[in-house]
From Swiss-Prot:
PANTHER family reported for this sequence: GLUTAMATE--TRNA LIGASE, GLUTAMATE--TRNA LIGASE, MITOCHONDRIAL-RELATED
Lineage: Bacteria, Pseudomonadati, Campylobacterota, Epsilonproteobacteria, Campylobacterales
Motif 'KMSKS' region location, chain numbering: 237-241
GO molecular function ontology, one term from the record: ATP binding
HAMAP family given in the database record: Glu_tRNA_synth_type1 (MF_00022)
Short sequence motif named 'HIGH' region, residue ranges: 8-18
The organism's place on the tree of life at top rank: Bacteria
Subunit structure: Monomer.
InterPro entries, A to Z: aa-tRNA-synth_I_cd-bd, aa-tRNA-synth_I_codon-bd_sub2, aa-tRNA-synth_I_CS, aa_tRNA-synth_I_cd-bd_sf, Glu-tRNA-ligase_bac/mito, Glu/Gln-tRNA-synth, Glu/Gln-tRNA-synth_Ib_cat-dom, GluQ/Sye
The entry's keywords: Aminoacyl-tRNA synthetase, ATP-binding, Cytoplasm, Ligase, Nucleotide-binding, Protein biosynthesis
Chain's role: Catalyzes the attachment of glutamate to tRNA(Glu) in a two-step reaction: glutamate is first activated by ATP to form Glu-AMP and then transferred to the acceptor end of tRNA(Glu).
Organism this protein belongs to: Campylobacter concisus (strain 13826)
Listed transmembrane segments: none
A UniProt-annotated Pfam family: tRNA-synt_1c
Protein name: Glutamate--tRNA ligase 2
Amino acid sequence: MIVTRFAPSPTGYLHIGGLRTALYNYLYARANNGKFLLRIEDTDLKRNSEEATQAIKEAFAWCKLDHDGEVTYQSKRFDLYKEYVKKLLDEGKAYKCYMSKEELEELRASQEARKERPKYDNRYRDFTGTPPAGIEPVIRIKAPLSGEIVIHDGIKGEVKFKVEDILDDFIIARSDGTPTYNFTVVIDDALMGVTDVIRGDDHLSNTPKQIVLYEALGFKVPKFYHVAMINGEDGKKLSKRHGATDVMEYKKMGYLPEALLNFLVRLGWSHGDDEIFTIEDMLKYFNPNDINKSSSTYNAQKLDWLNSHYIKTLPYERLAHDMLEFGVDFKALVKGELLLNSLRERSKTLIEMANSANAIINAPKSYDEKAWAKFINENSKEILAKFAQILDRDLDAKGYEELTNKFLEQNGLKLKDLAQALRIALTGSSVSPSIFEVLEVVGSNEIKNRIQNLLKEEK
């Protein structure tokens, strides 16, 4: 059985790069009837944040990335890690190192002066004497002294590391007894039954150390897939300076989870020339072996395009529900479905839709200055006043279109002579959906009120 996991540290918000990693792991497990597990790597007790843990869970819930079983918290497993430290010490595969901080700094300085790679010099590897007083030891693994470590990566292919270039007897437990990152990861992945590890390629350098630990502990090494980073449009690693990176910020900005997941799955993976992928499509086609080796580029315009696609195509009930968070209750409006369906054709985000909806639902408190200067004058005011006089009952969009065409014909006018001024009267702006749909939503009495308000306006 395929078992994957997502293992964030709750020291900050969930980055969209992290969500992409979670998505890839989720898809691979679900497509193969496997398990997708969530582990919170909260061993850094000083930097952990309960808010960050909650944000991770909220992001998963929003994107509907359900995980199997209970969440695993590393902070609740310290006794377990200590057992495995003791096991390695008892088997002679790890040892206590009593080097002081000053000695380590002196060693590093001398190695750097000789232009050597800074690394531990193994002085306590086979130590049998009396340990120095007053020093709490760290625990180090006995790493191989020579040879190669080979990773058969599902994305990058065969990756070889020379032991002399990258390894030393690295620390697995600090002097206060807390375990190190690589040690806890290996134990948890093994005990949780993880078969496939899909993660960012910033973890590639950790992998040789983890393989050393898998072998020392007698655990089976999982299959690794190291995914290249997401870059900003300037070619540099994606960060806050490129815009929002917090997953829940995208929700606040009016993006749909379907659009964000579709966007992220394509940042590093493709299936032919297809651009639109529902979760069902992803489950059908996704394979981690097809992930690109090279970095992908964040494209804000592509995300907007995808979001507008899902706004156009998702069911009315779903969009109406999501719009409640943006202060618009379409279901409470007499013509709510008509209004939403009209606005969805021209909205890139739910915030845009909310702003457009509020401009139609509520009488304008002010008018766009450029639109006013361009379209409002004594002539257009006279046309609006005449138009208001013929509004004696509510109609549907087709009825308002017929009424308007008759009015224009009788007065020797064209639609452009009325439409923009009428839009400004109704919404405060010269931009709106179909003017006839706006008329239907607003209704004749309110249309007359808004025209009167504009006519009273002094500019």
